[in-house]
Structures are given as structure tokens and as C-alpha cells.
């Protein structure tokens, strides 16, 4: 089967969040299963020079944006058997950063059309075009409206994946008709209209052949008012057209047995993990105390990550409990300031690394006993999967993908790979942390829960098969 992924970011070329991790890893798994899969991205200024030097010029075309035709260069490179195409246009993508520009509606309108105009140039007719988040969500509608009479595009089916419903791509009406060239008949409540504007995310949901999101729990949550951000009614109406498939991680990249960034490589031995803990305590200038539970967070310092809960309980936890706490991340300046101040108050119990450093994050995962992730909402979450891959036992709130991937430890059966609490409540979180540290002090139970976490399959293999089934289903139903 021929597959094309269209997305706004992909690691390691350009990344702002978990979307880039998915686009980097899922195509590799599908390629390993025998699929002819390719990926198309914008060629941003921020792509590192070493990748730019490897790109080959494939061709060029012109893309209509309103009354103008814009240059569209096409470059490519091959990574692990997957061809990555880059759409080159200096006016739209030769800027710092990726998002947040006043003309994002125009920039990504260009990109949506460029993805389709690219296909004849590279002589590739995908069976399925898989679009990700609002940045590529107009592609199914373009196929339905602008390209419907062109036989080259007739057989293409579409899948649309919602990675985060919070960001929907809402722009004025003119983007639809004047820039994209889509007929105004689609500007209805049943189409793309959203409170007098055009909603890209809504277009993907309405016009794709199948809609997925990144965990079964999140698929249920977004059908409610609290998580649906105005689209809950539409999503509730999708029925079997909406699926939730949990993300995986790249287990070759995240592998404690081969990771050169950690102090001591290990497969399953908790003794070697203890050596990583000691090395992390030394690196962060904390007292070396292998018997004390070390809890970590690797996170963006933003509201959605549950940091207000952490702030409410941290003084009590560090003052009364025998525990060390380390945090790594950047974000809201008020959170950055608070965590710095807390680390100053408890220099023997806490370290706040207000930066992001990928090698250091690996050492956090390898060196910590517990990994705290009390998110307000979490469509899937990848950090908890990486933590478990490195044997750091997660403490999570039961939301989104956290609920699907972390299962509370049962002392009687020995089952479970972490600890969890349901309500968004600081008191409940504190009780869960204290239960986890109590289990930590019971070696027999701690070995079980740690090995359960360390021994799980967090690869993309199972999820990739689920996507394969959807691709086969929508191509057969239209055959």
C-alpha cells in the first residue's frame, strides 16, 4: 500500500511537541511492515544545516494561493527507508519558529495545496493520505472540492488524526474561498463554519474518510463538553468513523541498554539503575542517597501539565517526607520562577533545571525511581512511556493516554506498572505519591512494579497494525 503522511513537524528536523515524535516514529514502523510510506513537511528555516545539506532537489511547481501562484520547491532525503519531502518556499517558511504568525492561515493554506500539487511532480499516487492536526486538515476538503474531477487524485482516501483538539486553526471566511479556492457551499454548520469563521480542524473531521486520535480515553473525552472545545457534538456524531489509537515511542532511540547519554547502560537490572540514580544525584548536587526515593518531572512548564497541583503540595511533601524531587523543563515564566525558588528553599531535596536538554532528560528517566505526570489533560503523552521504558515508575492522573498506558499497581496480584489518581485534586495526588513511596520501601513490591514498567512493550508495532487495518478498511470500502 502507498501511504503519504502530511504534517507540520517531524523529529529530528523540526520539533515543538509530541506530534514531531509521532511523525518521526510511526512511518518507520509502517515501513518495517512493508508499506511504501513517505512524509511531506514544510522546509523551515530552523531545520539544522546538516539535514539541509543532505537534501536533494526533486523538482518544483507553482501553487495557487488566491489570485497568485507561489513557487513550490520540492526537496527530499531518505531516513531509515522512509523518503521525507520538504516543501520549499522562503516567503512562508523562511522564518524563525513554526507557528504564531498573523498569516498562519495563508501559510498552511499554501502547504495544504502544495501537498497535493507535489504528487504528480514526484509521480506518487498514495492509496491513503494521512493528515495530522489542523495544519493539514484542509487536504480532505480540497480533494473533495477542488481536485474531485482530476483523475490523478480520484483514488486517494484520507485519514485525519487529532493530536491535540485545543489547537484548531480558526481563521476568517476569506481563507476558505479567496486563498484555498474552495466553494462557499462548504461554509455551513455541517461543513467548516465555526462561529462565523473557518475551522481547519473541523474540516478534517467532517471530510476525511476516517478520523483517529491518540488514545481510546481521549477519543471518549473529546466527545464531552469539557474536553471537546466546541467540537464535542460533531465528534459524538462520528460513531465508528472515530478511533482512538495509543501512540508508541521509538524503542531503538529510547533504549537504556544502548543509550550513550546515561551513566550506566542496563536492560532489566535494578542495581545498574541505582548507579544511574547516584550519578544523577551527583550531577545535580543533591546528597547521594540511593535509599531515598527520587521523583522526577520532564515537562513543559504550562498549566495543562498539572503544575498547580504540584505547587500546592510541594512544600509539605519536601518538608515532611523523605524524598528527592527533580524537574527539567521550560515554559511559563511564573512556573519557572516558582520552581527555582522552591529548589533554593530545599537545596538538599530538590533540583530545578529550567532548560531543556535531551541528554539530561535521558539521565532523569534513567536515574529517577518515580516519574510524576499529573496532567489536567493529556491526549496521549509520551513522557510516561519513555519513563517506563527506563524503569521509572509513573505517577499519573487518569486522563487521556495516561489512563490507557499506566495501570495502578495492585499489591495483591502484583499487576500494574504505576500509580494513578482520578480527580484533579492536590490532596489525591499527595496521597498517591505517598502510596508510591510506601511501596518503594517494600523491596518485594518495588521490584514487581519496576519490572512491570521496564518490561512493557512501548513500541509502535501494535499501534501501526491498528493504523494498517484502518487504511485497508477505507480503501476496500471505496474499491
Predicted regions mapped to residue ranges:
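Catalytic cores of nucleotide-sugar-dependent glycosyltransferases that transfer UDP/GDP/TDP-activated
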Residues: 1-479
Amino acid at each position: 500500500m502507498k501511504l503519504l503522511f502530511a504534517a507540520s513537524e517531524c523529529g529530528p528536523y523540526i520539533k515543538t511537541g509530541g506530534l514531531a515524535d509521532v511523525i518521526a516514529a510511526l512511518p518507520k514502523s509502517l515501513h518495517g511492515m512493508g508499506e511504501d510510506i513517505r512524509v511531506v513537511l514544510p522546509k523551515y528555516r530552523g531545520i539544522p544545516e546538516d539535514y539541509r545539506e543532505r537534501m536533494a532537489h526533486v523538482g518544483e511547481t507553482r501553487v495557487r494561493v488566491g489570485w497568485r501562484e507561489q513557487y513550490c520547491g520540492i526537496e527530499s532525503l531518505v531516513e531509515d527507508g522512509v523518503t521525507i519531502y520538504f516543501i520549499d518556499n522562503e516567503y512562508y517558511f523562511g522564518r524563525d519558529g513554526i507557528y504564531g504568525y498573523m498569516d498562519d492561515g495563508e501559510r498552511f493554506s499554501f502547504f495544504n495545496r502544495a501537498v497535493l500539487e507535489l504528487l504528480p511532480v514526484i509521480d506518487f499516487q498514495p492509496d491513503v493520505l494521512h493528515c495530522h492536526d489542523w495544519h493539514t486538515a484542509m487536504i480532505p476538503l480540497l480533494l473533495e472540492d477542488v481536485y474531485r474531477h482530476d483523475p490523478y487524485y480520484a483514488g486517494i482516501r484520507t485519514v485525519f488524526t487529532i493530536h491535540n483538539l485545543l489547537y484548531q486553526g480558526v481563521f476568517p471566511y476569506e481563507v476558505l474561498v479567496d486563498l484555498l479556492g474552495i466553494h462557499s457551499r462548504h461554509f455551513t454548520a455541517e461543513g467548516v463554519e465555526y462561529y462565523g469563521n473557518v475551522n481547519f480542524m473541523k474540516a478534517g473531521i467532517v471530510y476525511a474518510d476516517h478520523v483517529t486520535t491518540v488514545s481510546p480515553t481521549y477519543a471518549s473525552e473529546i466527545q464531552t463538553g469539557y474536553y471537546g472545545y466546541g467540537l464535542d457534538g460533531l465528534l459524538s456524531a462520528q460513531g465508528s468513523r472515530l478511533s482512538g489509537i495509543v501512540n508508541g515511542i521509538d524503542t531503538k532511540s529510547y533504549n537504556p541498554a544502548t543509550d550513550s547519554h546515561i551513566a550506566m547502560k542496563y536492560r532489566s537490572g535494578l542495581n545498574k539503575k541505582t548507579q544511574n540514580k547516584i550519578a544523577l544525584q551527583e550531577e545535580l548536587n543533591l546528597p547521594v542517597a540511593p535509599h531515598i526515593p527520587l521523583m522526577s518531572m520532564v515537562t513543559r512548564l504550562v498549566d495543562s501539565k498539572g503544575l498547580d497541583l504540584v505547587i500546592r503540595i510541594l512544600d509539605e511533601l519536601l518538608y515532611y517526607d523523605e524524598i528527592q524531587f527533580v524537574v527539567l523543563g521550560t515554559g511559563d515564566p511564573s512556573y519557572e520562577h516558582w520552581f527555582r525558588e522552591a529548589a533554593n528553599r530545599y537545596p538538599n531535596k530538590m533540583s530545578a533545571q529550567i532548560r531543556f536538554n535531551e541528554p539530561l532528560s535521558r539521565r532523569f528517566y534513567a536515574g529517577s525511581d518515580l516519574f510524576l505526570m499529573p496532567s489536567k489533560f493529556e491526549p496521549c503523552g509520551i513522557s510516561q512511556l519513555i519513563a517506563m521504558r527506563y524503569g521509572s515508575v509513573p505517577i499519573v492522573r487518569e486522563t487521556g493516554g495516561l489512563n490507557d498506558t499506566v495501570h495502578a499497581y495492585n499489591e495483591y496480584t502484583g499487576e500494574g506498572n504505576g500509580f494513578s489518581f482520578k480527580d484533579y485534586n492536590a490532596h489525591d495526588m499527595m496521597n498517591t505519591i505517598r502510596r508510591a513511596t510506601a511501596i518503594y520501601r517494600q523491596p518485594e513490591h518495588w521490584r514487581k512494579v519496576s519490572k512491570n514498567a521496564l518490561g512493557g512493550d512501548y513500541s509502535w508495532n501494535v499501534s501501526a497494525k491498528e493504523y494498517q487495518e484502518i487504511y485497508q478498511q477505507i480503501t476496500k470500502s471505496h474499491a
